[in-house]
């Protein structure tokens, strides 16, 4: 099998608004579930962190290199026999300006898979836990990742930081990614769906673009003795493909209207994939 390159991946996204794993870029058989498969997939996701930590002290880390490191999440899935299916970015391409992306949050996969995907359409910033930016050697690397750290200690301070920094980044030409559920959830629930993204979009005067992901291939670990130390790395199920769908560009308006329009599209799309939704 040949390995998909980041350049080919992003070129296909820009040309067609989507991507689907090519037959000759995927293992002929899906890997059997088990500890080795879980280890291989988890390494494909997490290697971005030691790689960034290694090159940053030498001043070699760039946004393009960060995207290349993150791209191993896609090639890693394909080497295990899974398909990566991305669709719906044509409207986003046609718009051409910075947008506010809102995405559901199921697992660690989308936090690594989305950067090389969204960078195909221009620079973007995103919200992440402050603890991630403070990992050894990663504090400076977080600048290349355009990360906006939040502590989750004071919701009000987090809100003000997101609104202030987000508005500045969008005004400067960055798109902005927020996971409105805050933490990873298997069920897409209105109760957990924050309006912070819609508020930022209204303040910054930019449209909202909803995105949904299906990354059930590696769920969060809920039970067992490894739950606390390996929470993010549940057993991998290679029978489940990775899917990403981008919704319409929702013109800027009142935050309440943006909030509802994005939620409705996301809920409807997830239901069409037979994923659980609580309206």
Summary of predicted features, one role per range:
Residues 98-100, 173-179:
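Residue-level preference for the first positions of well-ordered beta-strands
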Residues 38, 43, 48-57, 61, ...:
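Catalytic core of membrane glycerolipid acyltransferases/transacylases, capturing the structured
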Residues 117, 141, 168, 199-200:
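Hydrophobic/aromatic ligand-binding patch that stacks against planar heteroaromatic rings
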Residues 80-87, 159-160, 226-229:
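Short gly/ser/thr-rich secondary-structure transition/capping motifs
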Residues 182:
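Active-site metal-binding loops of divalent metal-dependent hydrolases
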Residues 138-139, 175, 186-256:
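A cross-family acyltransferase "interaction/gating" segment
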Residues 1-99, 112-113:
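Membrane-anchoring hydrophobic helices of lipid-metabolizing enzymes
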């Amino acid at each position: 099998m040949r390995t998909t390159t980041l350049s080919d991946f992003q070129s296909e996204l820009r040309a067609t608004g989507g991507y689907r794993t090519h037959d000759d870029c995927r293992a002929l058989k899906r890997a059997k579930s088990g500890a080795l498969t879980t280890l291989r997939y988890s390494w494909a996701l997490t290697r971005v962190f030691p790689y960034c930590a290694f090159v940053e002290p030498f001043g070699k880390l760039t946004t393009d290199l960060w995207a290349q490191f993150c791209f191993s999440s896609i090639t890693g899935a394909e080497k295990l026999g899974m398909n990566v299916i991305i669709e719906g970015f044509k409207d986003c391409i046609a718009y051409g300006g910075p947008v506010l992306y809102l995405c559901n949050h199921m697992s660690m996969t989308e936090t690594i898979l989305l950067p090389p995907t969204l960078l195909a359409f221009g620079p973007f910033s995103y919200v992440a836990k402050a603890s991630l930016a403070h990992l050894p050697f990663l504090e400076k690397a977080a600048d290349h990742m355009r990360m906006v750290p939040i502590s989750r200690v004071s919701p009000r301070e987090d809100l003000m930081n997101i609104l202030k920094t987000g508005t500045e980044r969008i005004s400067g030409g960055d798109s902005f990614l927020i996971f409105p559920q805050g933490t990873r959830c298997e069920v897409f629930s209105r109760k957990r769906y924050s309006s912070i993204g819609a508020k930022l979009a209204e303040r910054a005067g930019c449209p909202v673009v909803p995105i949904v992901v299906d990354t059930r291939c590696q769920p969060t670990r809920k039970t067992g003795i490894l739950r606390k130390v390996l929470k993010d790395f549940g057993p991998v199920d290679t029978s489940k493909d990775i899917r990403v769908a981008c919704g319409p560009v929702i013109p800027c308006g009142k935050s309440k209207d943006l909030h509802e329009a994005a939620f409705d599209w996301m809920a409807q799309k997830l239901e069409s994939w037979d994923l659980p939704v609580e309206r």
